[in-house]
């Protein structure tokens, strides 16, 4: 979890908390938030949460950077796991209210991602289609 702890954040506010879900009873509760069969098979989950009250807010438009900071640390976790040969998936299409209730989270703590982690069942990895570099980069 050091990879997450050391991730950069706006003005170094570090507005994140992480819940490592390992127990079968808690995994069953978490699975109700995102009822996909493949999701229930992971041995461990990390729920990435942010505290919107302490996150930095841009003074020009008051934009809260909690989600951005949480996204940065989520990707740090995914990259570190891949380096160790582990598979991950960034899940953000889950029932947030149910997740908050099942994990007994305070009102100011928002779960933004659930990362199932485990060793891939298959060595074959199907790459998703990616845009060509000239479709996403412009030089001025």
Provide a role label for each language-model segment.
Residues 1-44, 50, 140:
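N-terminal amphipathic, basic helical "cap/leader" segment at the start of enzyme domains
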Residues 114-140:
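C-terminal helix-cap and adjacent tail motif
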Residues 21-28, 52-55, 96-97, 121:
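Short, charged/polar surface micro-motifs in flexible loops or helix N-caps
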Residues 4, 46, 61-102:
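Small-aliphatic-rich amphipathic alpha-helix that forms the alpha element of a beta-alpha
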Residues 99-112:
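Short, electropositive alpha-helical surface patch
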Residues 35-70:
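Helix-adjacent hinge/juxtasegments
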Residues 17, 94-96, 113:
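Residue-level "edge-of-site" marker
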Residues 43-45, 88, 110-112:
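Structural motif
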């Amino acid at each position: 979890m050091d990879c997450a702890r050391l991730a950069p954040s706006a003005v170094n506010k570090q507005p994140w908390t992480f819940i490592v879900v390992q127990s079968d009873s808690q995994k069953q509760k978490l699975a109700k938030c995102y009822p996909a069969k493949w999701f229930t098979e992971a041995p461990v989950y990390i729920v990435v949460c942010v505290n919107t009250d302490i996150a930095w807010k841009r003074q020009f438009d008051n934009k809260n950077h909690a989600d951005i900071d949480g996204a940065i640390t989520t990707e740090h976790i995914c990259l570190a796991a891949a380096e160790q040969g582990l598979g991950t998936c960034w899940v953000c299409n889950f029932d947030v209210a149910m997740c908050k209730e099942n994990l007994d989270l305070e009102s100011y703590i928002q779960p933004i991602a659930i990362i199932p982690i485990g060793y891939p069942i298959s060595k074959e990895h199907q790459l998703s289609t990616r845009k060509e570099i000239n479709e996403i980069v412009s030089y001025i």
